[in-house]
Amino acid sequence: MKLFAPSSASHAKVLDMLALRTTEIAYITKETRFLDNALSFMSGVVWVTEEVTYQEASRAADLICSGFDALAALLKKGTKGFLGEVVVYPDSDREGLIIPVKFNVDGETYLMCMLGRYFGYSHYMNQLHPYSTAIIRNKSKGKAYGVYNRVFLSLYKTTINTLKRNHKIDMICSVPARPGQEDRFKKIIEELASDNEIENLNASFNCISNYPIQKASSQMERESNVKDAFVLSNRIDGATVVLIDDIVTTGSTLKACIRELKAKGAGEVICIVLGINQLGGTYWSSDAPELYCQDCGNKMKMMVNSNDGSFFYSCFGPNCRGVSFREAKRRIQTQVECRIDVTEKDYIL
């Protein structure tokens, strides 16, 4: 049975009945198929669930909670979504959530702390999501490289402090960089280890294979590429290790790291990730919301100011004007409100 609700027709009818805009409503559901459909609109989406698997986290709602009482409590506190997304969002002073995700490796379940979602280039939200832009610009060579390191460090710190309520953490490390590449997590891991008085494993945890870039690889290819790629030079019998990464796509790299840590005796491995790559990403209409330069007509991209980390849009034209995030948001919201198709009918088969 395939669920076609909510459709654009039902969406339009709800907006008309409530006299609201698309960006002023939120869908609440326990049904993952309904969730997938609801995510195709630029409305809020709340998923009510007792637990989240990694596969489910790859199609995540804006807000995830365990029940309707929990949802009411979160809204009363002003909680708006994932911790990372809330912290990075411009002018935000809201609270955010760290979502525990069940990550399966060789039949064993590991705790993954999810701080937000990452929308890749194929997702319609890619150029509409400040957190995704912050993550990718921060790790890509360019003017904004590293500009969000302190912000991301604070997110990791908050998560570790939360974990320490129920876990005795002994060691910390990040996914090792390929041979000859810069370790982007070096200073972050050093500070986290020092602040929490735990052992820094990065010096003894290394990548020994210059495996190919994983972006275009399948799940099977990724697993094969990183097989035996990571080596820990010492035993860590019984230790609880925190493993840090930024963007997780298939999880193949994290799995390879966990296998090596466990092989060297780790009792428990807990992952903390800035964002889980979001699958799907098809907008309900072929006319997805995008921002175009008013000077030259070319598409604009969200960028990060290298001085203060603020967001803006640019088409990179030498004589064209950039657009502030606030103004871009206003224009995109106007586009969204004008594009609801009211001719489609609802069907549940």
Predicted feature residues:
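Active-site-facing substrate-recognition patch
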Residues: 86-171, 207-235
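Short cysteine-rich clusters marking metal-coordination/redox-active sites
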Residues: 293-296, 315
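Short linker/helix segments within small regulatory modules
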Residues: 303-314
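Histidine/lysine/aspartate-rich catalytic loop segments that bind and position anionic ligands
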Residues: 2-5, 192-212
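PRPP/pyrophosphate-binding module of the type I phosphoribosyltransferase fold
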Residues: 17-24, 31-33, 37, 43-54, ...
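Short glycine-rich phosphate-binding loop at a beta-alpha junction
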Residues: 26, 167-178
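Short metal-binding segments enriched for Cys and/or His
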Residues: 317-346
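Asp-based, Mg2+/Mn2+-dependent phosphohydrolase catalytic module
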Residues: 1-26, 31-97, 282-286
